[in-house]
Structures are given as C-alpha cells and as structure tokens.
Amino acid sequence: MKGDYVTDIVKKTAEKLNCRYLENASMRDFTSFKTGGNADIIVFPDSIASLTAILKSCRENEIKTYIIGNGSNILVSDNGLFGAVIKIGSDFSNIELADENTIVCESGISMAKLCSFALENSLSGLEFAFGIPGTAGGAAFMNAGAYGGEMKDVLVECTHIDTDLNVGKLTGDELGLSYRKSAYSDNGYIITSLKLRLEKSDKESIKAKMYENLGKRKDKQPLEFPSAGSTFKRPEGYFAGALIEECALKGYSIGGAQVSEKHAGFVINKGNATSTDIATLIDYVRNTVYDNKGVMLDPEVRFLGEF
C-alpha cells in the first residue's frame, strides 16, 4: 500500500481512539541500534481495545503491521517500513500486585520499571533481568535471560490478542518457554499482559543482587555504543562470543558497524552505521564462524523490512 493511503487510514483510526501517532517517523529514534529508515506511521495504543481496533482497521484495509516494544532487539531496513508500526510501550504499561507474590503488568512496561516495582515490593526472582533494556512483553516473547535466570523461572501466564483478533491467554507449559523462545515466537499472537510469580525476600538483598548483575553488564558489555544486546543466540555446546573471537573477528568493522572489542558477541553501531552495514557484518561473522568452526550462529536480532 502507498504511504499516503496507509497514513491516512491509520491516522483516522488513531484519532478516533485518542491514541498518539507519528507520521513519516524515523525508526532510528525507536531502535537501540539507532539505525533504519522511516515508517509511514507509528501508532501508540493504550489499551487492548485500542490495539484490537487498530489491528482490525489495518487488516480490513490490507495494511501491513509491525509490532514493536522498545526496539531493543530489532534491526530495521534503511528503506524504512511500509505500513503501520504499532508500538506497545509506555502508553501500555500498567502494573499492579495481584497478591503478595504475584505481579500483573501490561506488556509495554519496561523491564527497568518492572524490576523496580518488584524491588519496591520486596519480591525476588527478577534480579537477573535488571538492566535488560526491552519491555516485559519483549522479554516474554523471547524468554529473555541472563546471569542464571530467565523469564521462564517467573512467568506463569500471558494474555494476548490472537490472529483472529480475539483475546486469550496461555499458562504454564502452554507458554512453550525454552532458550530464547516461547510459543509467541511462532504463533503470531501479540502479548498484552503478563503474570509473574515471585518470592518475598529481603529488599536489601534483592537490591544488592540487582546492582551486582548491573555491574557485570557494565564491565563486560559495550553499553556505551548502540546495539541490540547479544547479537547471536548461544549455540549448543559453545559460546558465540568465544567462537567469534577465535576467528579473529573482534574489532572487525564494515562501515560504521563493528564487532565489539569489549565483547565479541555484540555487533555495535560504532558511529553512523547503517542497518545495511550491521546486517552485512552479521552475515560476514556467521559465514566466517561457519567456515572456520563448522557452527552456524543464529541471530537473536529480528530483521524488519527489506534487506
């Protein structure tokens, strides 16, 4: 669909729903890589009802949709995104205690705010996630993890909008949580809220562990440069960063993209990188590691648009 048509349809829908939107918006402002072309329109739903209405309007008018959270695990084409970007973020971020050990939150809440809420309520179980840059929905979608913990340990239920635009939920084993994967990775459903079961603990102990993990992140990861976190999934029996370093790729650059000199498992935007630079470097690293080690690395990063 032509950009003007897309913008006009989605804009009218957003205005009826009193939802924020941005026209011809640069995706570099909405991704942690700080790259990518423009989107025809970005709309910010603030409820399940508004999200469903936007999706319904786009479907009826054959408008392609892209669902994003904090944009911390995506690489957007330099050509931009033709269609509607639906950002589930701070407008979609209510949080509350369901009981003394259970948090229920909307999927757009940042992991930082979720972890802070757990700390405020002396709830342990999310210490591993302190410093993860994405949203709670994004973390559930990929079963995010670090430092011996993962969402699988605390996530007990997700509410979603399915491909027929009906509201439903998955619980327990239905969530299909495994390494960097969930049932939502493949089913096309959109997570709208999460239920997490945690444990009461000493607030100071929780805080100490959170900041210990944050310190490890700062020491070992190139947080001073734009990136999407760990670029590759850990291959069974190996560590991606070690394989890349053994292939002498630490510091290797294509355009403004570089394999981090601090941690080879991170591809970073060293300065003025394009998405094409980053995608080309990711491919080069994958092929080089495969040629030298016989292991094909699987990207954690999702690619949106045409590459």
Go through the PLM ranges and name each one:
Residues 5-136:
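Anion-binding (especially nucleotide phosphate/pyrophosphate-binding) glycine-rich loop
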Residues 22-23, 74, 161-283, 287-288, ...:
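Phosphate/pyrophosphate- and phosphate-bearing ligand-binding catalytic cores of soluble enzymes
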Residues 36-37, 42-48, 75-93, 141-172, ...:
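Structural signature of FAD isoalloxazine-binding scaffolds in flavoprotein oxidoreductases
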Residues 37-38, 70-72, 81-84, 109, ...:
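Gly/Ser/Thr-rich helix-start
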Residues 61, 68-70, 154, 225-226, ...:
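Short, basic and Ser/Thr-rich N-terminal targeting/leader segments
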Residues 73-74, 115-118, 126-130, 143-150, ...:
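A generic local secondary-structure boundary/capping motif
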Residues 105, 130, 138-142, 147-148, ...:
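Core subunits and conserved enzymes of cellular information-processing
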